[in-house]
Amino acid sequence: MLKLDHIVISSESLDDGQAFIEDRLGIKAETGGEHRLFGTHNKLISLGTSYLEVISISPDLIAERTPRWFNLDNFTGHPRITNWVCSADFSSFVPHDLMPEIGDILDLSRGSLRWNLTVPKNGILPFEGFAPALIDWGVSKHPSKTLKENGR
């Protein structure tokens, strides 16, 4: 069974993404971290059991793998929702059986977090980015459990 894990807002810079969130929602995003494999960094906002991720290419990192995830190499313009990610238990099904274009399952980590994520070789999710990426957090604590609640 698939379940919404998080929503992705892409931005040309993390500062622009932060300003976008503060202007629209009146909430300051928490620092997430860096993804060295893709040369990106992010900030996060709690949505209860899921979260909002603001992501951009980091000017301080060199990507080890390109094209980058979420089609960030081709992203231009104002920050906006570009993708969504669904959680799944990869031990119970093979993502490629669901949708062959979903991409490779990459074993990723940042600090104490470990996860598996589907990433197409071209960085663009199926159906021109409309299909979700799939994520399996395994035994890692879901990021939403460590974020401040932003209820209003």
Predicted regions and their residues:
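Short helix/turn-capping signatures at newly exposed starts of structured segments
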Residues: 1-3, 53
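Vicinal oxygen chelate
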Residues: 3-13, 33, 41-44, 48, 51-53, 66-98, ...
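Amphipathic, alpha-helical segments enriched in basic
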Residues: 4, 20-22, 29, 76, ...
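Acidic-enriched, low-complexity/disordered segments with a strong bias for Aspartate over Glutamate
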Residues: 5, 15-16, 23, 60, ...
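Weak global preference for isoleucine
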Residues: 7-9, 21, 27, 45, ...
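Glycine/small-residue-rich interface belts in oligomeric ring/scaffold proteins
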Residues: 13-72
